[in-house]
């Protein structure tokens, strides 16, 4: 009887192990499929993601209403491009904290309009920052006075940027494409720092509020994986010449819901559609995130449109 019992137990145990292994394989395959098909992202909204989750280059297009604030991270390095309006600064700091940022290597202010620089003083007061980067401007006195107001008592150095300057962000590189050194530009939008971020062959173009005239002056660039559309989707930017040259796979637009300017303008959306770009907007989808993982760009949004 004992032998018979053992003979029945062994096959039963084998079947249990076999069935369990098969179930585990199916589960692993299902998880692998979800993660690599892009469906996984729908179950992991980016609102709770942190910069440290991915050592590669990541861009967060923050939801600051009718303004712009872009966080770039690579490894443990962080750069903030603009801050949005002063009234959005505390919310921006909360978002940066949620994304794991406790200090900044750089704060880039693309140009001195309140929807881009309004929160600069608050950010510099709250976060240790190595370098404040502002665009070269012919009125140096005004430039230094404005920068001094932002800096206050912050222990942060000031750097004046112009085309050709490069800034290391971990293994990523940020290159200034505009404005030129010693320029006499008097249109504040066209004074915008235009930045090219590069990492493992992936390129992101950040245009500030620069107009089509400036866009055309920095061409040719070749293919760009992600474009942060200029001037919140205004018809004055994101021109056909730029789009024909860079053929972006994705375009982010930072704008406020039901804003008084009507951003993004229909003409810009039509141009982007014609160029084949997938468009995501902060007014519709909240925080937008672009991560470079194994040489490929993965884009997610805080909420569905």
Residue ranges: model-predicted function:
Residues 1-305:
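Non-globular, low-confidence helical/coil segments that flank catalytic cores
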């Amino acid at each position: 009887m004992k032998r018979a019992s053992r003979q029945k137990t062994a096959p039963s145990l084998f079947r249990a192990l076999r069935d369990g292994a098969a179930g585990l394989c199916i589960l692993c395959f299902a998880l692998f499929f979800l993660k690599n098909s892009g469906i996984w992202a729908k179950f992991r909204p980016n609102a709770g993601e942190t910069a440290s989750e991915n050592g590669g280059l990541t861009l967060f297009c923050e939801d600051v209403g009718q303004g712009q604030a872009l966080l770039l991270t690579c490894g443990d390095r962080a750069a903030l491009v603009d801050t949005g309006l002063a009234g959005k600064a505390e919310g921006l700091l909360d978002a940066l904290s949620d994304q794991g940022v406790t200090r900044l290597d750089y704060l880039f202010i693309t140009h001195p309009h309140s929807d881009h620089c309004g929160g600069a003083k608050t950010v510099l007061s709250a976060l240790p920052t190595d370098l404040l980067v502002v665009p070269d401007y012919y009125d140096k006195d005004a430039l230094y006075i404005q920068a001094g107001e932002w800096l206050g008592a912050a222990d942060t150095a000031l750097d004046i940027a112009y085309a050709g300057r490069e800034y290391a962000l971990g293994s990523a590189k940020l290159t200034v494409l505009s404005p030129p050194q010693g320029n006499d530009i008097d249109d504040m939008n066209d004074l915008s720092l235009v930045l090219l971020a590069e990492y493992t062959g992936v390129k992101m173009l950040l245009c500030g509020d620069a107009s089509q005239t400036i866009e055309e002056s920095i061409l040719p660039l070749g293919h760009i994986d992600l474009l942060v559309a200029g001037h919140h989707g205004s018809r004055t930017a994101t021109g056909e010449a730029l789009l024909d040259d860079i053929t972006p796979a994705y375009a982010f637009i930072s704008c406020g819901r039901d804003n008084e300017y009507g951003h993004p303008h229909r003409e810009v959306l039509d141009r982007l559609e014609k160029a084949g770009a997938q468009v995501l907007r902060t007014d519709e989808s909240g925080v937008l995130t672009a991560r470079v993982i194994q040489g490929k760009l993965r884009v997610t949004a805080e909420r569905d449109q």
